[in-house]
Structures are given as structure tokens and as C-alpha cells.
Amino acid sequence: NYNYDEKYILSAVIRRDGSSRLSKNIRWGTFPSVSVGWRFDKEKFFPISRDVVNMFKVRGSYGVLGNENIGEYMYQTTMDRNNMTYSFGNQVVTGSAVSTFVDNNLAWEKKKSTNIGIDLALFNNRLEFTAEWYKNVSEDLLYSVPVPANAGVDNEVVTMNAASMENSGFEFSATYRNYDHALKYTISANLSTLKNKVTSLGFSTDRFITGAYATFVGQEVGQFYGYVYEGIARSQADLDNHVNDNGVVITQEGAGIGDCLYKDVNNDGRIDSEDQVVLGSGLPKINFGLNAHREYKGFDLSISTYGALNYHVSDDIYNSLNSSYGYSNKDVSMLEANRWSEDGIYLSDKPRTYIVSNGEAWNNYFSERMIQNAAYWKIANVELGYNFPDKWFKGIVSGVRAYVSAQNLYTFTGYKGYNVDYAGGTFTPGYNFCSFPSAKSFMAGILFTF
């Protein structure tokens, strides 16, 4: 660390880490970082009065971090004796053989971060601003690469250092404090943006598609991938007149009244896997927070909130309960739906159900029906407290505080899942797989300070 006259600031760190999860010859990694800052307001030529600008700092940093969040010994080949036989001396004998394909050169993931920002304090530090641009480049990402079916091994995927991506955006924060009167308060807000781009998937491929999620080089990671939903066939006329952009009637073999209709994207007159397209993103483009704290004659109130905008979620529980196919549990609305009228026109906004597969189960195709706008604003914490006057206790205790608080009080959202705070995977960021709901909790207590 170096600080010259509180104007020029330098900090540098270098660390060396090793992990037994990585291959022996490359399990050690060196990770440096450096940051610099310049207090522009400390210069003699700074043109604005110190009474107005209390701090004007320009800063920048660069650093490298390592990650090896994988299982143990995934770089080691294993032998299997299960049903491994061969002929020896005109007899069938048991042997061993390599049963899985592994990468013997697993190394550290590397995250290279660049940040440039300014810090500004005004009016005797009452008003503070920060603004920052960031770019994070992740290289040698450890992820599951498909193994060719003709490889002669048991595993379908293998963990390798095979991908790279970039995340960039801006972060802003503002805080205002007023402690000059009996009513004291602090208000703060923060906002960050995100732009994600996959720069490489390795091994001469430009795409990685797994089920309802697709990653393309040059685009966002783990986008939703499926069919464009065009409504429900309410009558035979809807089926007969369902045409593509060329006016050709679209063939959906086995589809009937009450089934979902999809767009013929490639205009070949039929619905198949070639009609799948990117449907949306599971990465929030904007994250924000709003917080407030007030004090008045011993009372204090704190409110903490946060939220996210411009992204979608596929909720596994919701989609399963509202699926039109299978024997598993269903939402009661599947029974309550008014599916037919007296003249045979299908009225429900839910497609017809299948107990067993009969041809194409069209209503279970992954489409826009199965993703939801997950924008939300969550009141995360509210606490009201009172600090009793010290004179009441005459030195027995130095302080007494009573408080009540609530966590996860309410979430403003149209999302129908149980939890907006789910954690998706690297290549499935918008997939909420059975995450537990956030418990709403209330507490009351008294804090004694001696």
C-alpha cells in the first residue's frame, strides 16, 4: 500500500493458490491485483471550494481471481469392472477398462476484472455519489461439454476449461444525510446494469444447446430456447386456417381443438425442432436498491429494499403444476378451467390435458407460455426501535434498546413462483429449479448494553 499526501493512492496484492481439485501439473495459480486512486480535490489547482466539494476521487483497478468450483478428482480417469469381460485361453474372464472420458488438464477458471470510477462528496459530506464502469472477463470456464455418442464411454458430458464470457456495465449509488435537526435521516439508492456476451465455447463450436436453454457465441449465456406460441386452437377452423408467413397451412400432426399452436419460423409448413428460437433472457439487466433510515427523539426506523428488472424466469414448480401432460400433481386451476361451451368452442386459457402421450403432446412443448416476467421490488427488512434514555437506569446499564423487525415483508411482482431470490446455473441463469420460498419472519427484542 502506498499513500502520498492523501492525494495519490496505490495498492497491490499478489496471491498464489493451489487446489487438489485440479490437475497436478497446473493446480497452482498466481492472481495479482492493483488499484490506484487520485484525490483530485486535494490539488492546489482544484477550482471548486472545499465547502462545496469535500471529495473528488478518481480511481481504477485491475485484478485476477481464480475459481475451481467442481467436484474432487474430476481430472482422473477411472477403471470399471462392471461387465468388463474378454476371452483368454478359450475362457471368458473378468477384466477392467476405462469407462469414462475425463480432461486430464483441468486448470483454474480466471476472472479478470477492470473497474474505473469516481467518488464525489458534497456539502459537508451530506451528499455522496459514486459512479463506476466495470468489465469482467471470465476465461477457461469449467463447464460440462457433451461427449460424442461414439466415444465408447459411459458419461454423456465431461468437465473442461472450454468457455469464456464478458460481463460489463455501470454501477451508481447516491446517499443523502441530514443530521442537523431533531429528525435525522439518511436516504440511499443504488443501481447497476449488466451486459453479458459469450466470447468462446471452445472446440470449434459456436453454440451449446441443452433442453430449453441455448448459448450462442456473441450472445448472452443461457437464453431461453423454444417455440413461438400463437395461441390455442379454439375450433376446427383455427386448425384449418393456421398458416405461416407464406400463407401455407401449418402441419401439427395429431393436434386437436384445445391444443397449442406454434409459429412456423422457417416457413416449411410444419412444426419441428428447426422452428425453435431464442425466447428471452434469464439475466437481470438492471438491479437496484432503495434504503432509508430515520431517527427522532430516541426512535429509529430502517427500511431496506431491492429489486431487479428486464429478465424472465422459467419456474420448474409452476410449470409442472400447470403442465397439460402426465400423472403428477396439478394446480387446482387445471380442474376449474372452463374448457368447453355448449357449441363445442374451446373457451379456457389453459390447453387440453393428456393423460398418456397420443402422438405429439403439443401442449408440453417449451414456449413463451413457460417463461414469466420476473421483475420485482422486495421490501427485504423493516426495523423500528427505541433507545431508552440513559438517565432512566442510573448507570446500571449503559444502554437499552427495544425493537421490532420484519424480514421478507412483501414483494411487488407479477412472478407466480415461490422465490424471486433463486440461484440459477451458469448456463441456465433463468431456471428456478424448486427453490425454497423466502420465509417471512417477525422478531421483537430488547438489547442491553453494559
List each language-model region with its residue ranges:
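Short, surface-exposed charged micro-motifs
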Residues: 119, 240, 291
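Short helix/loop capping segments that flank catalytic or ligand/cofactor-binding pockets
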Residues: 69, 225, 237-238, 302-304, ...
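Conserved SET/PR-domain catalytic core that frames the SAM/AdoMet-binding pocket
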Residues: 188, 198, 274, 284-298, ...
